[in-house]
């Protein structure tokens, strides 16, 4: 079962990306390094509800 998730920057809090994940394979929250346009650099983004 794939669900939509939102990825938020851990430093500024902006929700910059929307993605999908498989809850069966990844039950925990996802953390990815992505580009933050506000800070103009790559930061850690965490899954939010």
Curated annotation (Swiss-Prot):
Keyword Ribosomal protein carried by entry: yes
InterPro entries named in the record: Ribosomal_bL33, Ribosomal_bL33_CS, Ribosomal_bL33_sf, Ribosomal_zn-bd
Single GO MF descriptor: structural constituent of ribosome
Keywords: Ribonucleoprotein, Ribosomal protein
Any single Gene Ontology cellular-component annotation: ribosome
Domain of life according to the entry: Bacteria
One Pfam match: Ribosomal_L33
NCBIfam families in the record: PRK00504.1 (NF001764), PRK00595.1 (NF001860), rpmG_bact (TIGR01023)
Annotated protein name in UniProt: Large ribosomal subunit protein bL33B
Lineage: Bacteria, Bacillati, Bacillota, Bacilli, Bacillales
Gene name, Swiss-Prot/TrEMBL: rpmG2
């Amino acid at each position: 079962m794939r669900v939509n998730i939102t990825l938020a920057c851990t430093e500024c809090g902006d929700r910059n990306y929307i993605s999908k994940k498989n809850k069966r394979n990844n039950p925990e929250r996802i953390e990815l390094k992505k580009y933050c346009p506000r800070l103009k650099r790559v930061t850690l983004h965490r899954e939010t509800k």
